[in-house]
């Protein structure tokens, strides 16, 4: 009887040890799969943000992630959603990354601040967004990813333009255009910045500067996709209609009648 009882206890211990081993093995596999997904999403982020988002959404039980994996997940998911034009309603997710990278990785710390600024801007919290963007700007001399640098300058340009700080806005958009990066990745960003420079210059009454910027945009038309081409032509047509240069406006798809103007 004693031997049977002892054998039963031994068997229970063996089963328990095996269960613990299986659980540890599964946890290890889950960790490796999550890390693989995070690395894949990071590689696809700039060229295929929609694809990166799907990879991140495939991670099973992301709430169980910890430490660096959780911080990377928070940063990458915020980045993928932001670059896929999905508006966030809270900054709680990106705050995980901001807190974790505060004294660790300056590149990811800066990226976290960039996207926190973007989230706050989308939430209409312009003052908070400005402070976060300015903090991100302070790290620019210490980072190497010029894509992040460009987006920080653009974010500050948009916020200052929105708040009618036009001199600062022009300065930041000029800085964003001047950043040396791979053209194919950021051509749309340059178009956006130059278009804002053209519009602000015109609003300020600097017609020569506006002409120069619009000329740069027209030179870029062969290099961009059809959507950006349409955007450039449309904005140039508006500019020419404001100048009452109707022939030019019509050439780029706008007529005076489309603006409710009776004088042609």
Where are these regions (language model features)?
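Bacterial N-terminal signal peptides
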Residues: 15-26
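A "functional boundary" signal
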Residues: 2-5, 26-264
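Bacterial N-terminal signal peptides that target proteins for export
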Residues: 2-16
């Amino acid at each position: 009887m004693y031997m049977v009882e002892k054998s039963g206890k031994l068997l229970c211990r063996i089963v328990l040890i095996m269960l613990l081993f299986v659980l540890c093995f599964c946890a290890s596999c889950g960790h490796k799969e999550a890390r693989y997904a995070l690395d894949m999403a990071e590689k696809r982020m700039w060229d295929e943000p929609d694809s990166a988002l799907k990879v991140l959404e495939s991670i099973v039980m992301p709430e169980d992630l910890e430490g660096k994996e959780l911080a990377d997940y928070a940063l990458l998911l915020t980045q993928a959603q932001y670059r896929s034009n999905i508006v966030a309603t809270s900054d709680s997710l990106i705050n995980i990354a901001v807190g974790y990278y505060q004294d660790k990785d300056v590149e990811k710390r800066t990226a976290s601040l960039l996207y926190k600024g973007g989230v706050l801007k989308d939430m209409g919290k312009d003052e908070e967004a400005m402070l976060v963007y300015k903090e991100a700007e302070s790290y620019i001399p210490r980072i190497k990813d010029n894509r992040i640098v460009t987006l920080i300058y653009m974010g500050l340009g948009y916020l200052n333009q929105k708040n009618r700080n036009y001199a600062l806005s022009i300065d930041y958009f000029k800085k964003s255009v001047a950043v040396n990066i791979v053209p194919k990745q950021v051509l749309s960003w340059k178009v956006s910045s130059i278009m804002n420079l053209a519009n602000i210059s015109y609003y300020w009454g600097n017609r020569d500067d506006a002409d120069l910027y619009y000329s740069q945009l027209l030179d870029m038309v062969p290099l961009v996709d059809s959507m950006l081409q349409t955007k450039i032509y449309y904005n140039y047509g508006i500019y020419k209609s404001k100048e009452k240069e109707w022939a030019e406006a019509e050439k780029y798809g706008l007529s005076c009648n489309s603006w409710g103007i009776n004088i042609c």
